[in-house]
């Protein structure tokens, strides 16, 4: 039989978990620590840790509208909460009724792809970025009500080919649900005639 953690030990672990993953929900924390949601909320209050919505706002303190060059922010699928152009970016996508199949409540795959692809475009430090090629993998179905956190990282800038490689990994909680590798053309490599494509 597993020994129950002391309140102090649980609160220390809860604080570490939230610092590692600020997007974790109270429900996920309750499941992880095998306590009620009310206990998690009381622990957060005692530790002065804000609720999820406030933590997300805190992480998203940058003015991303000024940061993103390659497309209007409203065209990004999901909400960008962190971005450093030509390096990395993070977005959150809430799966709602309009994103799922009615009969099984599973998210339509094109929404996960669109979140990852638009994040790969947004992270490029150019006025125009186009997806030349992508390799994607759906690891498990995402369901109604789940929150998908996509993390994009610029892996390689191939100047001789005029491409930038962006890898995107999408998570629900700590579980990997989608991966994608996107080869991106940059505006400096794009011609009106499409000769460089």
Swiss-Prot record:
Q: Which Pfam families does the record match to this protein?
A: 4HBT
> Per its UniProt record, what InterPro entries does this chain match?
HotDog_dom_sf (IPR029069), Thioestr_dom (IPR006683), Transcription_factor_FapR (IPR017275), WH-like_DNA-bd_sf (IPR036388), WH_DNA-bd_sf (IPR036390)
Q: Which UniProt keywords apply?
A: DNA-binding, Fatty acid biosynthesis, Fatty acid metabolism, Lipid biosynthesis, Lipid metabolism, Repressor, Transcription, Transcription regulation
A biological process (GO) of this protein is: negative regulation of fatty acid biosynthetic process
GO molecular function (one): DNA-binding transcription factor activity
* Family recorded in the similarity comment: Belongs to the FapR family.
What task does this protein carry out? Answer: Transcriptional factor involved in regulation of membrane lipid biosynthesis by repressing genes involved in fatty acid and phospholipid metabolism.
Q: What is this protein called?
A: Transcription factor FapR
């Amino acid at each position: 039989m597993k020994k129950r953690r002391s309140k102090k030990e649980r609160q220390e672990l809860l604080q570490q978990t939230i610092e590692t993953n600020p997007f974790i929900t109270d429900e996920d924390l309750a499941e992880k620590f095998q306590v009620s949601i009310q206990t998690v909320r009381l622990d957060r209050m005692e530790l002065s840790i804000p609720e999820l919505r406030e933590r997300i706002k805190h992480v998203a303190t940058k003015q991303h509208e000024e940061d993103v060059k390659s497309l209007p922010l409203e065209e990004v699928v999901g909400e960008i909460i962190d971005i450093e152009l030509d390096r990395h970016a993070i977005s959150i996508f809430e799966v709602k009724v309009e994103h799922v199949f009615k009969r099984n409540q599973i998210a339509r795959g094109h929404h996960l792809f669109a979140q990852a692809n638009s994040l790969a475009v947004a992270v490029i430090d150019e006025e125009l970025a186009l997806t030349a090629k992508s390799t994607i993998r759906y690891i498990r179905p995402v369901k109604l009500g789940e929150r998908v956190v996509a993390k994009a990282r610029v892996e390689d800038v191939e100047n001789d080919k005029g491409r930038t490689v962006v890898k995107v990994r999408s998570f629900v909680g700590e579980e990997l649900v989608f991966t994608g590798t996107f080869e991106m053309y940059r505006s400096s490599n794009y011609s009106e005639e499409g000769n460089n494509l």
